[in-house]
């Protein structure tokens, strides 16, 4: 997330300090827009231009292109969809995470529901975060 794009919105993003707080305390997280308005799915479909300009500024900094490439690689290795990788990543944190989702079609809803059983290994989480393999 481009933190500068959040200025004046009243919205907070999970940065390193907040991630550490949740990890250390076990406090649950409820990420709103857990799928970043479908960013990675849109990237996978070559439809990034359908993302609203404000959302593109917020969710599409260069680091997310690198994260997308890693998510796409992991999706190919596991047979999961990009959406399932994204939600699986959130639900594989060392604290309870309850992603808020907003599917816009029956197909998106089905894909999202299938993500409910996805737990990634610590190695897969590390790969998504850093690109490093064990």
Residue ranges of model-derived segments:
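Beta/alpha (TIM)-barrel catalytic core signal, keyed to glycine-rich beta->alpha loops juxtaposed to Asp/Glu
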Residues: 1-133
